[in-house]
């Protein structure tokens, strides 16, 4: 008598192919790696309520010189988070985006402070957000931020996030829909005044 796999395994027990077993093991291994990295925020959606609480907590720890800068800082942080969240679903096409816990708050504070001395302040900024996947290669556009659409921009600001290339290279491209991307703590700001012929000013932050 020849038994089918269903009879060998018994009634009510699902049949799992060898490929399914391998995929499941890889998924579990990937989850263990991501959960062990406690220096990074791991979210399926970086706009979850828990993530917003972490942002607010990091903002509370900042010592802003005045109330106005604090309000601008909070608003800019949320706009950067929104930009990254939208890019996660569109241009990045990843399910999980890992980033250092204070990265967005740090970037937002530097963006606000870069507007000091500008004719319209932060309201005159046109902000472009990029991702640097590899040094020397073309930057990937993630989105744009316009603090006040009613104001004609007086300066352009490029925010360049950097991809962590050590983000499990053997695993991150196995699952197209489950791709995991991780950002480094370092970033770059490039400021160009639109009313001046001066060369852009580049700041690297570690």
UniProtKB/Swiss-Prot annotation:
Protein name: DNA damage-inducible transcript 4-like protein
Pfam family, one: RTP801_C
Role of this protein: Inhibits cell growth by regulating the TOR signaling pathway upstream of the tsc1-tsc2 complex and downstream of akt1.
GO cellular component: cytoplasm
Family per similarity comment: Belongs to the DDIT4 family.
Principal subcellular localization: cytoplasm
InterPro entries on file: RTP801-like (IPR012918), RTP801-like_C_sf (IPR038281)
Gene Ontology biological process: negative regulation of signal transduction
Keyword set, alphabetical order: Cytoplasm
Subcellular location: Cytoplasm
Induction of expression: Induced by LPS and zymosan in macrophages.
């Amino acid at each position: 008598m020849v038994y089918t796999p269903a009879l060998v395994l018994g009634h009510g027990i699902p049949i799992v192919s060898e490929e399914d077993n391998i995929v499941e093991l890889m998924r579990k291994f990937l989850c263990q790696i991501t959960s062990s990295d406690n220096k990074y925020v791991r979210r399926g959606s970086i706009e979850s309520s828990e993530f917003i609480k972490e942002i607010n907590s990091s903002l509370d720890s900042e010592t802003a010189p005045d109330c106005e800068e604090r309000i601008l800082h909070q608003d800019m942080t949320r706009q950067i988070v929104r930009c990254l969240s939208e890019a996660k679903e569109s241009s990045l096409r990843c399910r999980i985006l890992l980033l250092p816990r204070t990265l967005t708050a740090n970037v937002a504070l530097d963006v606000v402070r870069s507007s000091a001395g500008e004719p319209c302040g932060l309201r005159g900024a046109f902000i472009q957000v990029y991702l640097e996947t590899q040094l020397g290669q073309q930057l990937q556009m993630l989105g744009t931020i316009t603090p006040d659409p009613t104001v004609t921009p007086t300066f352009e600001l490029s925010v360049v996030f950097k991809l962590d290339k050590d983000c499990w290279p053997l695993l991150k491209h196995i699952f197209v829909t489950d791709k995991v991307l991780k950002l480094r703590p370092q970033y770059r700001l490039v400021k160009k005044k639109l009313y001046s012929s001066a060369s852009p000013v580049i700041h690297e932050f570690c």
